[in-house]
Design a protein with these regions (language model features):
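Function-determining surface determinants
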Residues: 1-274
Length: 274
């Protein structure tokens, strides 16, 4: 898998701009973009096997903290939208209380994200510049081409040996699929069908997991007797999303990862990505 310079360096540029301009109450699209480029940068560092470099490890530690903080903001945006899909924008008593609770959590999480970015902004700038120079050096020396195949191959082998998919391991399966997809996207010549198939599973399983998290919060906020109808609708929707997610994940696995020899699966996928 040959890495493309533009795809490799883009997350570094985008993150520098976003971290310098992040407002105290970022819009959902700003949060989404921040999370996406932290993920892509993590994938770049992994694909180029840069974790052994101290400067890259320091940057990974920083972006992981930002990604997690941004994820907590993103979760509230999505969960509020999920509640509104059940009761509509007019709402109902229990739904209004739940949305208000989620909105308060969103404000709290956004403030936490902003404080983190503001506190670490100078360190981020330094580490991003260092890593940018390191990546350009590796690309110039051709190291990325030689070492870029190893991390995707590891993920492919893991996915090829994955146990039977169920509710207990589906979320972790999604994480591995997402990591592989980001790595393959570093190559502009990657097969669009493969990238789309990985993206479909990422989104479908992620949607189910959001409903799981919503049910956990709803059970803490709502009364099981007086608010039982809303709790039931959330639970049933989550169950429906689980079946859809499992079906999509199984299709992906059977099409791309269900080969007798995991090495053959790896060769097949890497050929599609080159």
């Amino acid at each position: 898998m040959k890495l493309q310079p533009d795809q490799v360096e883009k997350p570094l540029r985008k993150l520098r701009m976003q971290l310098n301009a992040l407002p105290p109450n970022p819009r959902p699209e700003e949060v989404h973009s921040l999370r996406m480029y932290t993920r892509r940068l993590e994938a770049t560092i992994a694909a180029m096997a840069l974790e052994r470099e101290k400067k890259a490890r320091c940057l990974l530690k920083l972006i992981k903290s930002v990604r997690k903080a941004a994820g907590e903001v993103r979760d509230m945006d999505v969960l509020i939208g999920n509640v509104l899909t059940i009761c509509g924008h007019q709402g109902c008593g229990p739904a209004v209380r739940l949305v208000e609770h989620l909105a308060k959590m969103r404000v709290r999480n956004a403030r936490r994200l902003h404080r983190l970015v503001r506190r670490e902004r100078r360190e981020f700038s330094t580490r991003l510049k260092q890593s940018s120079r390191l990546i350009r050096k590796k690309m110039k020396n051709g190291v990325a081409d030689r070492e870029g195949e190893t991390p995707p191959q590891i993920l492919i082998t893991e996915l090829s040996h994955w146990p039977s998919l169920d509710e207990g391991n589906l979320h972790l399966f999604r994480i591995r699929v997402k990591e592989l997809r980001y790595m393959l996207q570093l190559n502009e010549q990657a097969d669009a069908r493969l990238v789309d198939a990985l993206g479909e599973v990422k989104d479908t399983v992620g949607e189910w997991h959001d409903w799981v998290e919503l049910e956990k919060i709803a059970r803490k906020v709502l009364d099981p007797r007086s608010d039982g109808d809303l709790l039931k609708r959330i639970r049933l929707t989550g169950g429906e999303k689980l079946q859809i997610a499992l079906a999509a994940a199984i299709r992906l696995r059977e099409r791309y990862f269900h080969l007798p020899d995991a090495r053959k699966a790896g060769v097949k996928i890497l050929q599609m990505a080159s």
